[in-house]
UniProtKB/Swiss-Prot annotation:
Family indicated by similarity: Belongs to the class-I aminoacyl-tRNA synthetase family.
Signal peptide region: none
Xref: NCBIfam families: leuS_bact (TIGR00396)
Motif 'HIGH' region boundaries: 40-51
Organism: Bacillus subtilis (strain 168)
Family annotation (PROSITE patterns): AA_TRNA_LIGASE_I
Biological process per Gene Ontology, one example term: leucyl-tRNA aminoacylation
Cellular compartment(s): Cytoplasm
GO terms for cellular component: cytosol
InterPro entries: aa-tRNA-synth_I_CS, aa-tRNA-synth_Ia, Leu-tRNA-ligase, Leu_tRNA-synth_edit, M/V/L/I-tRNA-synth_anticd-bd, Methionyl/Leucyl_tRNA_Synth, Rossmann-like_a/b/a_fold, tRNAsynth_Ia_anticodon-bd
Listed name of the protein: Leucine--tRNA ligase
Length: 804
């Protein structure tokens, strides 16, 4: 008989909620364990089977740690601001708050149906004013410290939609929605100075227990490079520009320079003859994204401005070009070109017939750029030197002559923090008519997002909030000065930068969280989520955390001590699950047909947690069959406990039980859930062969199963005669002495060929092994008519009889 999963799961889910079984104890006597999931965006589509993979992993750890005596913090919440809800509101005219609440209710229902041991009293929602009050408070602190500032930044402006689009919403120069043309246009935007933390974000990665691949992605994103700034005067002008180069030693090889088309100097230095060509080129590249412009594979384009720069090292005139591969937002927006020793410069020079000079020996620069090390030539005071010495010498010369200086730069840009959207946290700043700006006073937070019947683009590039005049227009009660509220909102990243801190003290009206509680719970012990957040979310969260550390709010430099990325669950055809492919598996259907415990067990048993694996219905059926076998081992068809279960421990199953406790504990701790479950299966197979089932071992098994299949385990625990929940029962421990084999298997060989296998006492001596081998019936048969010449016995391994 199989167990009735619908009844059992409903029964225990109701019990856990009513009894607040998983409420965090906040008990300072106990060691803490903080297990965190990347909280989901509550989409209209609901949960898919990929979500529970990571959630089950943290749940197994949380349940085990509670049983091991830890005080466990295991919370869940909603990253609920964001574009889809706004888009829904634009399309339907409905309030995104209503849509978001429906989605959250659905997500919560689905998550509770999977039996995760979350403390629901700590549930948070980034769109709740009591939550985003503190998101706004952090912004004010950044603003006070000069880390939030306004700058003119090129953005993706779509005239037809009357709005600014994120890079992800632009495909081949057109809007993803409706395919309207998109152009780059400078606009005032809020920026956060993450670059001020670049070195610390880089250095502190060393202290984290994170996958090396994720650390590398962050290192590359930060992109620290050492080199020099070189100043170039412009011939016939008072202006000059600066370039950054990692190879200042090749300065003698520069044959032209390139400015970004948006560079402030372009208009001023372009000659009358080149004006038309330059303006046409700038217009042509306006719709290109930064990614398209810097694509290494594309054909190089550019236009000569007619102006020349002076090479500071030798006074040579170098033509100044503009080209789209140089970005105004990156570095200084200007580069010196050394085509003999840089591949991109070489390609550009060949395309436009510009000269190529050799200044480092080692290749044939007429055919290809030589980027390796070598002796410097045609380089005056650098001749004969190799790369490192030449770099040091030329930097010393640049600094001495005031033509440049040593410089460290980063690929990391400051974080563009404003969005021209309605559905986000309002930025608490007021711009006054006299040109000044002030922050909304702390005591007036939260600055609540106003309700509106009409969420539509403003048409000016401002957010839809600009349409709500009564909210936007303010008057200073003291001076009568008129002002306008900031109409940009924060990006979705803002709420997820610090949510793990609010879980620690979610209802505190006076502080982001109490210092004592932060001291107790930080850092997060285990953070599990998808690798797609490897860079942005994790980098932004680390930045905010370091800032909060600097102002004394949090006690740790880093938020997440251990990070783990679960793999992806693919469709049965090994393709990514997506609505368009029609291969999405809905967990609701699996919970109805197979049960939540089966889904949890199957997702953990599919393979290693970090691997991407295809969904398989037969695998799901196999997981259910195992749980049915467990049920039938304990419960007779009559519903009574199996009569073979006897009080106490006893020798039956002793060794396999202790081995199971050891392996399952070790595998769960190491997130190797698939091998932990395999060992549970080994135990069940052995138990089916046994004539009696010692109760102590059967109860221990139920405890080991409970983190993976908690509903079934609770029901079996009750059937074994216990009242209340298994959740805080002591985790089993193993006895090492019980793991030693009393017997071992040895092979018996005749003239080197295996003839028999014997079970012998583990401590049998050579003499005993010789006697046991010769006494075996099979061996006797083989020896008939032969004379034994020699016997070699190796205790614990083999006996080899030489006979003829």
């Amino acid at each position: 008989m199989s167990f009735q999963h619908k009844e059992i799961e409903k029964k225990w889910q109701t019990y856990w909620l009513e009894n607040k079984t998983f409420a965090t104890l906040d008990n300072n006597e106990k060691q803490k364990f903080y297990a965190l999931d990347m909280f989901p965006y509550p989409s209209g589509a609901g949960l898919h089977v990929g979500h529970p993979e990571g959630y089950t992993a943290t749940d197994i750890l949380s349940r085990m740690k509670r049983m091991q005596g830890y005080d466990v913090l295991h919370p869940m919440g909603w990253d609920a601001f964001g574009l889809p809800a706004e888009q829904y509101a634009l399309d339907t005219g409905n309030d995104p708050a209503v849509f978001t609440k429906q989605n959250i209710d659905n997500f919560r229902r689905q998550i509770q149906a999977l039996g995760f041991s979350y403390d629901w009293d700590r549930e948070i929602n980034t769109t709740d004013p009591e939550y985003y009050k503190w998101t706004q408070w952090i912004f004010l602190k950044l603003y006070e410290k000069g880390l939030a500032y306004v700058d003119e930044v090129p953005v993706n402006w779509c005239p037809a939609l009357g709005t600014v689009l994120a890079n992800e919403e632009v495909i081949d120069g057109k809007s993803e929605r409706g395919g309207h043309p998109v152009e780059r246009r400078p606009m005032k935007q809020w920026m956060l100075k993450i670059t001020a933390y670049a070195d610390r974000l880089l250095e502190d990665l060393e202290e984290l227990d994170w996958p090396e691949s994720i650390k590398d992605m962050q290192r590359n994103w930060i992109g620290r490079s050492e080199g020099a700034h070189v100043h170039f005067a412009i011939d016939g002008h008072d202006d000059s520009f600066t370039v950054f180069t990692t190879r200042p030693d090749t300065l003698f090889g520069a044959t032209y320079t390139v400015l970004a088309p948006e560079h402030a100097l372009v208009e001023n230095i372009t000659t009358a003859e080149q004006k038309e060509a330059v303006e046409a080129y700038i217009k042509e590249i306006q719709s290109k994204s930064d990614l398209e412009r810097t694509d290494l594979a594309k054909t190089k384009t550019g236009v000569f401005t007619g102006a020349y720069a002076i090479n500071p090292v030798n006074g040579e005139k170098l033509p100044i070009w503009i080209a789209d591969y140089v970005l105004a937002s990156y570095g200084t927006g200007a580069v010196m070109a050394v085509p003999g020793h840089d591949e991109r410069d070489f390609e550009f020079a060949k395309t436009f017939g510009l000269p190529v000079k050799e200044v480092v020996k080692g290749g044939n620069v007429e055919e290809a750029a030589y980027t390796g090390d070598g002796e410097h030539v045609n380089s005056d005071f650098l001749n004969g030197l190799h790369k490192q010495e030449a770099i040091e010498k030329v930097i010393a010369w640049l600094e001495e002559t005031k033509n440049g200086e040593k410089k460290v730069t980063y690929r990391l840009r400051d974080w563009l923090f404003s969005r021209q959207r309605y559905w986000g946290e309002p930025i608490p700043v007021i711009h006054w008519e006299d040109g000044t700006s002030t922050a909304v006073p702390e005591e007036e937070l939260p600055l609540i997002l106003p309700k509106t019947d009409e969420i539509k683009p403003s048409g000016t590039g401002e957010s839809p909030l600009a349409n709500i005049k009564e909210w936007v227009e303010v008057t200073d009660p003291e001076t009568g000065k008129k002002g306008r509220r900031e109409t940009n909102t924060m990006p979705q990243w803002a709420g997820s930068c610090w949510y793990f801190l609010r879980y620690i003290d979610p209802h505190n009206p006076d502080q982001l969280a109490s210092p004592e509680k932060l001291e107790k719970w930080l850092p997060v012990d285990m953070y599990i989520g998808g690798a797609e957040h490897a860079v942005l979310h994790l980098l932004y969260a680390r930045f905010w955390h370091k800032f909060l550390y600097d102002i004394g709010v949090v006690p740790t430099k880093e938020p997440f001590q251990k990070l783990y990325n679960q793999g992806m669950i693919l469709g049965e055809n090994n393709e990514k699950m997506s609505k368009s492919k029609g291969n999405v598996v809905n967990p609701d259907e699996i919970v109805a047909s197979h049960g939540a415990d089966t889904l949890r067990l199957y997702e953990m048993f599919m393979g290693p947690l970090d691997a991407s694996i295809a969904w398989s219905e037969s695998g799901l059926d196999g997981a259910r069959r195992f749980l049915d076998r467990v049920w039938r081992l304990f419960i007779e068809d009559s519903g009574e406990l199996n009569g073979k279960i006897v009080e106490g421990a006893g020798e039956t199953l002793e060794r396999v039980y202790h081995e199971t406790v050891m392996k399952v504990t070790d595998h769960y701790e190491g997130l190797r859930f698939n091998t932990g479950i395999s060992q549970l299966m080994v135990f069940i197979n052995e138990a089916y062969k046994a004539t009696e089932l010692p109760k102590e071992y059967m109860e221990g098994f139920v405890k080991l199963l409970s983190p993976v299949a908690p509903h079934l385990a609770e029901e079996l625990w009750e059937k074994l005669g216990h009242s209340g929940t298994i959740a805080y029962e002591a985790w089993p421990v193993y006895d090492e002495t019980k793991l030693v084999d009393d017997e071992v298997e040895i092979v018996v060989q005749l003239n080197g060929k295996v003839k028999a296998k014997l079970q012998v006492p583990a401590d049998a001596t050579k003499e005993q092994l010789e006697q046991l081998a010769q006494a075996d019936e099979k061996v006797k048969e083989q020896l008939e008519g032969k004379t034994i010449r020699k016997i070699i016995a190796v205790p614990g391994k083999l006996v080899n009889i030489v006979a003829n």
